[in-house]
Structure formats: C-alpha cells, structure tokens
Amino acid sequence: MQAVKCVIVGDGAVGKTCLLISYTTNAFPNEYIPTVFDNYSATVMVDSKPINLGLWDTAGQEDYDRLRPLSYPQTDVFLICFSVVSPPSFDNVSSKWQPEVSHHCPKTPCLLVGTKLDMREDKEQLKRLEEKKITPITTEQGEAKCKDIGAVKYIECSALTQKNLRLVFDEAVRAVISPAGGAKKDKKNNRGCLLF
C-alpha cells in the first residue's frame, strides 16, 4: 500500500488542527488549544486505491519557526492554510509559508487551503472585520494566490460544516499519486522532501 505524508502549515489559529480533528474524528473541537494534535495515520480510499495517509500538524506561531522544519523530511505534499476571514494569514501565505516550504522542499507539491469557509457569511464575523476595515478573502483572491505561489490546487473548506473537507485530503493524495505533470513519482528514488 502506498504511503503519503501530508504536512499542514499556516499561521496559528487559522484552523489547521480543527481541519485534522474534524476530518479524522468527524467531531469539531469547541475550544482553541494551540497544536497538540499528534501525527495521525489512516488508510483512506482515493480513486479506488488504498492509501496510508500520514497527517502532520505543525505549530504556526513564530516561537516554533526553528523546530517546525524538523517535520518536513520525507513530506509528499503540503497543505498551506489560511483563514478566509483573516487577511493577515492570507498575506503570510506568500510572505512566510510558501517561501519556507519551498526553501526546505522545493519539489514537493503544495495545495492552498482556505479554512473557516462557514465564517465568510457569518454576520458577527463580518461585523468584526468591518470594524477593522477589512473584508474576507474571496475565492478569486485564493485562486490568484494559488497561481502566484505555484500551488497545484486551491480549495476552500469548513472544518465545522465539513464542506469540502474530504476533498482537501483527497486532492492532497491525488497531487502525489497522480501529479498533473504525467508520470507518477518513483517512491524509492524521489521520496518528497529531504533535509541535510
């Protein structure tokens, strides 16, 4: 069975851990606790193929900038996450996360993931954003950022409602087992990211 290592990166509090917990347990955590989610492994079916999917959560806070890359070796695909209701987290995709990932793992595919999709229409959230004179990130902005950073796909999702949640992880697996460029990766000779 093919194994796929998927590492999730992005600013603190954009919903990375909620994404993983909702996907793996079908339950949404009610409180924010900075990353305590351990590595998770599950057998999933993608395009009728069994895949051993390893999910690695990372801390987004600056305090962990030197430790976070230790989880990158052997990564097959990255999910670069931002919250659609946090323009600063969106800006950090191109100023921090894509440069960090491409520095350590230049040939590893990335998906851009807009989280908290359910909050884009939330009246309370929109009021808070309006008070700060900012607006939610649009789908078009996400798609443009995807092209700008060279990500293979842009997907918006909600861990709360689970809208597009499974799609995020299915597409992450597809980026590894069926890359758009044609030939599949030879797992023996090209195993994702290597750090020396």
UniProtKB/Swiss-Prot annotation:
EC number: 3.6.5.2
Regulation acting on activity, per entry: Regulated by guanine nucleotide exchange factors (GEFs) which promote the exchange of bound GDP for free GTP, GTPase activating proteins (GAPs) which increase the GTP hydrolysis activity, and GDP dissociation inhibitors which inhibit the dissociation of the nucleotide from the GTPase.
Enzyme superclass (EC): hydrolase
Cellular-component GO terms for this entry: cell projection; cytoplasmic vesicle; cytoskeleton; plasma membrane
Matching Pfam families: Ras (PF00071)
Gene Ontology biological process terms, A to Z: actin cytoskeleton organization; actin filament organization; cortical cytoskeleton organization; establishment or maintenance of cell polarity; mitotic cytokinesis; phagocytosis; regulation of actin cytoskeleton organization; regulation of cell shape
Propeptide residue span(s): 194-196
GO molecular function (one): GTPase activity
Entry annotated with the keyword GTP-binding: yes
SMART domains according to UniProt: RAB, RAN, RAS, RHO
Span of the annotated motif Switch 1: 26-37
Membrane topology, from the record: Lipid-anchor
Intervals of motif Switch 2: 57-75
UniProt modified residues of type Cysteine methyl ester: 193
Job description of the protein: Small GTPase which cycles between active GTP-bound and inactive GDP-bound states. Involved in cytoskeleton remodeling. Plays a role in phagocytosis of bacteria and host erythrocytes. Involved in capping of surface receptors. May be involved in cytokinesis.
SUBUNIT field: Interacts (GTP-bound form) with PAK2 (via CRIB domain).
Domain comment, as recorded: The switch 1 and switch 2 motifs undergo large conformational changes during GTP/GDP cycle and play important roles in the interaction with downstream effectors.
Family listed: Belongs to the small GTPase superfamily. Rho family.
Protein name as catalogued: Rho-related protein racA
Species: Entamoeba histolytica (strain ATCC 30459 / HM-1:IMSS / ABRM)
Lineage: Eukaryota, Amoebozoa, Evosea, Archamoebae, Mastigamoebida
Gene that this sequence comes from: RACA
